């Protein structure tokens, strides 16, 4: 029997990220979009189990893209919710919440502001749908800004934090003004979660836990 996944609860209320991300976006994004990825992932895994039992290799191959896309959507969104925290909460203060990560950012990018500029340029440079990520390259902790297409997840590095650049993440509130969404996301970024992921990655003990 195939493993099934369920929608994780948000670690805050749907209106907790206002005014940066409105309640309506959070409700639709979590209850509809994320749930759809999980529903489709479970269906694909069930079909995979059936195909495996029948030794149906062509069907197993056909299901790979569905599992990758919907599984990636589940991974990415599960990480994204934990990347966020209510505006002006202690978690959004990098000095208090992420001193180790802040020092690494400053050492590599010169300053937090220069890093934000570089990260923002990557987000706004995405064509179509995708994600922007700050990742750590395992032990040693070298930081890197990367983007992934559609729902491709980060699997070969430690995802410190990511930002959803699909239109469903911002369009109801920001319309086509992606720059304002990107500017606002820093106000609700959970630096404490980012710090934990970064430190675990440096120590070589990071596991992708949803």
UniProtKB/Swiss-Prot annotation:
InterPro entries xref list: Fe/Mn_Superoxide_Dismutase, Mn/Fe_SOD, Mn/Fe_SOD_BS, Mn/Fe_SOD_C, Mn/Fe_SOD_N, Mn/Fe_SOD_N_sf, SOD_C_sf
User: What subcellular locations does the record give?
Assistant: Mitochondrion matrix
Cofactor(s) listed in the protein's UniProt record: Mn(2+)
Entry keyword annotation includes Kinase: no
Q: Kindly state which reaction or reactions the protein catalyses.
A: 2 superoxide + 2 H(+) = H2O2 + O2
Quote the EC number. 1.15.1.1
What is any one of the record's Gene Ontology cellular component terms?
Answer: mitochondrial matrix
In terms of Pfam families, this protein maps to:
Sod_Fe_C (PF02777), Sod_Fe_N (PF00081)
Tell me the residue numbers annotated for binding Mn(2+).
29, 77, 164, 168
**Superkingdom per UniProt:** Eukaryota
Its quaternary organisation is: Homotetramer.
According to its UniProt entry, the function of this protein is described as: Destroys superoxide anion radicals which are normally produced within the cells and which are toxic to biological systems.
This protein is called: Superoxide dismutase [Mn], mitochondrial
Gene transcribed to yield this protein: sodB
């Amino acid at each position: 029997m195939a493993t099934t996944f369920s929608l994780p609860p948000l670690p805050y209320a749907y209106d907790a990220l206002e005014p940066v991300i409105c309640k309506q976006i959070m409700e639709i994004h979590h209850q509809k979009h994320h749930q759809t990825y999980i529903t489709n992932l479970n269906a694909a895994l069930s079909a995979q189990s059936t195909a495996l039992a029948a030794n149906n290799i062509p069907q197993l191959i056909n299901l790979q893209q569905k599992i990758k896309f919907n599984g990636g959507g589940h991974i990415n969104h599960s990480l994204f919710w934990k990347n966020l925290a209510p505006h002006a909460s202690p978690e959004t203060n990098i000095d208090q919440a992420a001193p180790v990560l802040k020092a690494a950012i400053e050492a590599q990018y010169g300053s937090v502001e220069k890093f934000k500029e570089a990260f923002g340029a990557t987000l706004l440079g995405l064509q179509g749908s995708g994600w922007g990520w700050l990742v750590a390259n395992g032990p040693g902790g070298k930081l890197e800004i990367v983007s992934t297409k559609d729902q491709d997840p980060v699997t070969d590095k430690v995802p410190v934090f990511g930002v959803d650049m699909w239109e469903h993440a911002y369009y109801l509130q920001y319309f086509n003004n992606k720059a304002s969404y990107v500017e606002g996301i820093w106000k609700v970024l959970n630096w404490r979660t980012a710090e934990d992921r970064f430190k675990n990655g440096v120590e070589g003990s990071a596991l992708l836990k949803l």
